[in-house]
Amino acid sequence: MQGTLSVWLAKRGLIHRSLGFDYQGIETLQIKPEDWHSIAVILYVYGYNYLRSQCAYDVAPGGLLASVYHLTRIEYGVNPAEEVCIKVFTHRSNPRIPSVFWVWKSTDFQERESYDMLGITYDSHPRLKRILMPESWIGWPLRKDYIAPNFYEIQDAY
């Protein structure tokens, strides 16, 4: 079942895949990494002017990585606001997704956190570097295949 945004994108020949609706009835779409930046600009012009959140997750050990964007269309006098969830999947061997920092500035720290925890490179992001872990940290802590380094635990000292 397609939602109104999916139908609107299809009429304009914009390639995407409808993933249905979540438990709150919010439409979820899958966009290919190579199409994401242009579709993001179109969505912004269409009225999705607020990026509520961006996150990323590891789909499965050895599998794909996903970057998830929750967008809201806020218009004066329109209640409730329209929402959409966009998922962009990428291969873990070379995880690259175009940054949408220049479309929604609020994604700055969120894309940096996704880079820091999962190693997804957001192309054209102006300050893509670690934000939570030290620069010297090796690996991507939230990947399912991540092997945690052995640390000396305080409780072992007693």
Curated annotation (Swiss-Prot):
It is an enzyme of class 7 (translocase). Its EC number is 7.1.1.-. It is a peripheral membrane protein. It catalyses: a plastoquinone + NADH + (n+1) H(+)(in) = a plastoquinol + NAD(+) + n H(+)(out); a plastoquinone + NADPH + (n+1) H(+)(in) = a plastoquinol + NADP(+) + n H(+)(out). PROSITE patterns: COMPLEX1_30K. GO terms for cellular component: chloroplast thylakoid membrane. Belongs to the complex I 30 kDa subunit family. NDH is composed of at least 16 different subunits, 5 of which are encoded in the nucleus. This is NAD(P)H-quinone oxidoreductase subunit J, chloroplastic. The gene is ndhJ.
